Design a protein with these regions (language model features):
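Structural detector for helix-capping/boundary residues
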Residues: 48, 62, 75, 121-124
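A short coil-to-beta-strand element that immediately follows conserved catalytic motifs
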Residues: 71-80
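Acidic, metal-coordinating catalytic segment for phosphate/diphosphate chemistry
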Residues: 1-25
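Active-site-adjacent beta-strand/loop module that shapes the phosphate/pyrophosphate-binding cleft
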Residues: 82-109
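Short, well-ordered beta-strand micro-motif
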Residues: 28, 99-103, 120-122
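NUDIX/MutT-family hydrolases
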Residues: 110-141
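Conserved Nudix-box catalytic region and its N-terminal flanking loop in Nudix hydrolases
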Residues: 29-67
Length: 146
């Protein structure tokens, strides 16, 4: 995958075939707290993988509805990052992630994903809790821009 990103984490190991996964994630704040998704595997920004033909904005709208049951307003693109990692279940993995800033607007449905719980954490704590290094970077960029 040859998408130019703002920041790359890790270095691809020569001779390895990486599984690409493009996704979009939301950074949203309320009263100094950032929304995170708590799962059995750790903390993540709300969002997920893009489906074929989806834009980052469309992906965010779908994922936020599925994970949280909210509609969302997208304000801006914060940046993009990718990572080269060895994932415990996927193997050689290359996530490419778009980060958008926005606001949760209306609760319109019950979340579909039962093991995903939204929690609000102070911005610095949220940055430190996030599992993927690239998502920590996105929150750090958001904090610096404020």
């Amino acid at each position: 995958m040859n998408l130019k990103t703002d920041r790359t984490f890790g270095v691809p190991e020569p001779g390895r075939r990486y599984r690409d996964r493009v996704g979009a994630y939301l950074v949203t704040e309320h009263a100094g707290h950032i929304a995170l998704i708590q799962t059995p595997k750790g903390y993540f920004l709300p969002g997920g993988g893009m489906e074929p033909g989806e834009s980052a904005e469309t992906c965010i709208r779908r994922e936020i509805l599925e994970e949280l049951g909210y509609t969302v307003r997208i304000d801006e693109v914060l940046g993009t990052a990718d990572m080269y990692v060895r994932h415990e279940t996927i193997g050689w993995f290359h996530p490419v992630q778009y980060y958008l800033r926005g606001e949760l607007i209306h609760k319109v449905s019950v979340p579909i994903e039962e093991d995903h719980k939204m929690v609000w954490r102070p911005a610095i704590e949220a940055e430190n809790l996030l599992f993927p290094e690239c998502q920590r970077w996105a929150v750090a960029c958001y904090i610096k821009r404020k």
